[in-house]
A protein has these predicted regions:
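Terminal-appendage/accessory-domain detector
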Residues: 1-102, 195-212, 219-447
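Short connector loops/turns at beta-strand edges and beta->alpha or beta->beta junctions
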Residues: 88, 107-109, 114, 136, ...
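Function-dense linear segments that define catalytic or interfacial modules
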Residues: 82-95, 104-122, 129, 136, ...
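Hydrophobic alpha-helix position signal
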Residues: 58, 116, 169-170, 412
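Conserved, well-structured ligand/cofactor-binding cores
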Residues: 73-76, 97-105, 109, 118-131, ...
Length: 447
């Protein structure tokens, strides 16, 4: 029987062979959908308190480069990656890879764009580097490993985001195989991010810090810095340390069965993905119920929903994004659960608060976070129920380009106005030479 290639060696080989890979139009289209989504959620968060704070700190560091903060000046690539990576996750509205790695595009595109600007790389090179970084993160988080980390209290997006960022940077910096191995080692020894931070500014910071740490790892490797090269395989490495009972390990041969990018998911709602099935179900029921006549609400949800999105009494808009009761209450009240619905005004709406108080979570063992139901018990004794076997935005029930354009417009028009449509069209044709400079010129004016 053929002996499995060590995971670390397979990852290094996958990164090193990036220039030789030719991607199909389908794959490039998927990468560009990630890019459009990334710009939409990042630009929409330009005034978010977390984004503003991180930008102020990064700007205070002083040294400049050629990489731009969104709506800001040219700074070092590390500073741009930190600021832009944080912005991309401030609204918790960014794409999600449900195999276990979480929000991959946030740190990955932040690094790809920063280094492409800094080093004059082409749009095609940036796309190729992003795809490689995305695959590294998605494959390391697959096989139940990422989900196990989440149950253990770790934020997979933060952990695997460092590897996607390091891989993307390694490609754009032209690292050799030895340097790539060291870069992955440095990225691995910096992993972190706790689920206990969900509902606070620290959660989006996880992704900005992952972007910066991954880029730093590659920069250090290029400068001759050496690190452990066995962290993806050794018992005292990534899986053995973070899952100490050995119940789940990194999947062997993780780069041999097509591209995980084609299984990415996108959010129609500006809240934790684990709430979306219940939002879908609630919106189905909204036209059939009068909120004031609801006596009791049962939310059928996955164990993961209970683990990460079950805040029973949210007090801030950020907490609301991780409260399936609040998100379902929005849906039942006829709201679309877009970013504007996660506001202090909406959160304090007495009718919405009344629905939250009437809600209870019924965990459905063995179900995925993409499925759920809402059951409404009315004061007249009637019961209404809507089941959602697969929430909108996931593979099998995907978001269309039309849906993505509507999401993008809703986020960007308040910021860019008439420039929104030209920006969208430019991103859709991102592989065209000269597009990167054109795009960044549109989104780097100061506000």
């Amino acid at each position: 029987m053929k002996q499995a290639t060590p995971i670390g060696d397979a990852a290094v080989n996958f990164i090193a062979t990036t220039p030789a890979r030719k991607h199909t139009p389908e794959v490039l289209d998927a990468a560009k959908m990630c890019l459009v989504d990334w710009f939409g959620v990042a630009l929409g968060a330009v005034n978010a308190p977390a984004a503003q704070a991180v930008r102020r700190v990064a700007l205070s560091w002083g040294p400049t480069g050629k990489a731009h903060m969104l709506f800001g000046p040219a700074v070092t690539p590390a500073a741009a990656a930190l600021a832009n990576g944080t912005m991309a996750h401030c609204m918790d509205y960014d794409d999600t890879h449900l195999d276990g790695a979480g929000h991959i595009s946030g740190p990955t595109w932040a690094v790809a764009l920063a280094l492409a600007e800094e080093h004059g790389k082409t749009e095609q090179e940036a796309l190729a580097a992003f795809i490689t970084g995305f695959e590294i993160s998605a494959r390391l988080g697959a096989g139940g490993f990422g989900r196990k980390l989440q149950y253990n209290g770790f934020h997979p997006s933060s952990i695997f985001g460092r590897f996607s960022a390091a891989a993307t940077a390694a490609v754009l910096l032209g690292l050799d195989r030895t340097q790539i191995a060291y870069a992955l080692g440095v990225a691995g020894t910096t992993v972190g991010g706790l689920n206990g931070s969900f509902g606070t500014m620290s959660k989006p910071f996880h992704l900005g810090k992952a972007a910066m740490d991954g880029l730093l790892a590659a920069d250090l490797a290029r400068a001759g810095f050496e690190s452990a090269t066995h962290l993806l395989d050794a018992e005292n490495g990534l899986s053995g340390t973070l899952v100490q009972d050995g119940s789940v390990k990194l999947a062997p041969e993780p780069f041999t069965d097509g591209l995980a990018l084609l299984r990415n998911a996108y959010k129609p709602y500006a809240c934790c993905k684990a709430t979306h099935a219940c939002v879908d179900a609630a919106r189905k029921l909204s036209a059939r119920v009068t909120p004031g006549l609801i006596q009791r609400i049962v939310l059928g949800a996955s164990p993961m929903t209970l683990a990460v999105a079950a805040k029973p009494n949210p007090q801030t808009p950020l907490e609301g994004k991780f409260s399936v009761a609040y998100c379902a209450a929005l849906g039942l009240s006829g709201y679309a659960a877009v970013e504007g619905d996660f506001s202090d005004t909406r959160l304090r709406d007495p009718d919405v608060r009344a629905l939250i108080a009437k809600s209870e979570i019924a965990v459905q063992p063995g179900t995925e976070l993409t499925e759920g139901f809402v059951e409404v018990h009315l004061t007249d004794g009637k019961t209404l129920r809507a089941d959602v076997p697969l929430a909108l935005g996931n593979p099998g029930n995907p978001m269309s380009w039309t849906g993505m354009e509507a999401k993008f417009a809703g986020l960007v028009e308040p910021v860019l106005g008439d420039e929104t449509r030209p920006l969208f069209e430019a991103l859709r044709r991102f592989e065209t030479p000269g597009t990167l400079a054109k795009v960044m010129a549109m989104v780097t004016r100061t506000t």
